[in-house]
Amino acid sequence: MTVLTNSLTEVAQQTRQAAIQLAGASTETKNQALEAVAQALEAATPEILEANVQDCQQAKAAGIANALYARLKLDATKLKGAIAGVRSVATLEDPVGTVQLKRELDTDLVLSRVSCPLGVLGVIFEARPDAVMQIAALAMKSGNGVLLKGGQEALHSCQALVKAIHQGLSNTAVSPNVVALLTSREETLELLNLDQDVNLIIPRGSNDFVRFVQENTRIPVLGHAEGICHLYVDQAAKLDQAVEIAVDSKIQYPAACNAVETILVHDAIAPQYLPKLTAALQDNHVKVLGDAKTQAIVDVGPATETDWATEYGDLIVSIKVVASLSDAIAHINQYGSGHTDAIATEDDQAAAVFMNQVDAAGVFHNCSTRFADGFRYGFGAEVGISTQRMPPRGPVGLEGLVTYKYQLKGQGQIVATYAGSDARPFTHKDL
């Protein structure tokens, strides 16, 4: 792989040159490349799964945390789903070349704002080999090159995946150099210094890791931090429905960043709801912790102040009884990570207040927090979920990987014509 024989600067420059060519590629060319990549991944499935088994065995021996192991493991079903995600990106509308604004400044002087690729992305992620396929597909469709740096625990899986991607692209009009893999820890720090060649860094990991990246690079950072997600069960909730939402939000994939970590319950329904909830969670092997009011109703372990600010990423959940909707919102805004928070209620006014006042990228009403996902949103896939307030926010798909440029077409006009006492007026007419 070129990344192993060339310096990182050389690799980044090769990726940038390939991205410049890709930026001008037609939608058909990019879609053909994505289909070729999907076919190559299918053909390489045995090698990819074998590499992942090697990674998983080494990770187990090293005592990897359960949450990281769940993200690391790539079975045939998960791989098949990721390949389907690559194909789904090909069906999405091309985000490049969209005319966002067209305005006549004067006769034969027309301004357009047109979407264009960012350039080269640097994506650093933990034990998520499936992220390689998601990110590579989105980068190619949006006309960007990408430098991928996975966690060391996923090294063999990432190498097998990128090898297949390169093989798929080798017979297309898209250069394999648009996707490159970094393999050493030292390259992570070096990547952060490549502000001449990399246009956006996307770190996927803990808050501490994202903060470290932000403090050690001059490159813009799209922060994807922890997912401390909440479910608030209001006094007007349908209790059985709220149990189903809570269980799905916790157990469907507990290692995911959109899994619920804290459940807040209105005290008016706590005596009826908590026994149902804890029984359902414990039947699914979830360790339940609770505040003093929760412990007075059901037999669970104690939740401490630390628990409210913890992303478990595992079959653990904390429960707190609150006196009101406003108390629930205050708790979420204090301890949440701004990822995804949900309310279960039949009171539309309460739901509206919750959805307006909770500060998160995703606010849901009567549904699982697990819906916070680019594929489920119809984005095809995602490079990550941004919890920052500036856009892009939430699951970042194609639209978050393009910027725009202003194109002005004239017939020899000069600014002097439009200045001075007899200045020619602008027409400023939208076309």
From Swiss-Prot:
GO terms for biological process: L-proline biosynthetic process. It catalyses: L-glutamate 5-semialdehyde + phosphate + NADP(+) = L-glutamyl 5-phosphate + NADPH + H(+). It is found in: Cytoplasm. CDD domains: ALDH_F18-19_ProA-GPR (cd07079). It holds the Pfam family Aldedh. PROSITE patterns: PROA. Keywords: Amino-acid biosynthesis, Cytoplasm, NADP, Oxidoreductase, Proline biosynthesis. Gene3D superfamilies: Aldehyde Dehydrogenase, Chain A, domain 1, Aldehyde Dehydrogenase, Chain A, domain 2. Pathway: Amino-acid biosynthesis; L-proline biosynthesis; L-glutamate 5-semialdehyde from L-glutamate: step 2/2. HAMAP family: ProA (MF_00412). Belongs to the gamma-glutamyl phosphate reductase family. NCBIfam families: PRK00197.1, proA. This is Gamma-glutamyl phosphate reductase.
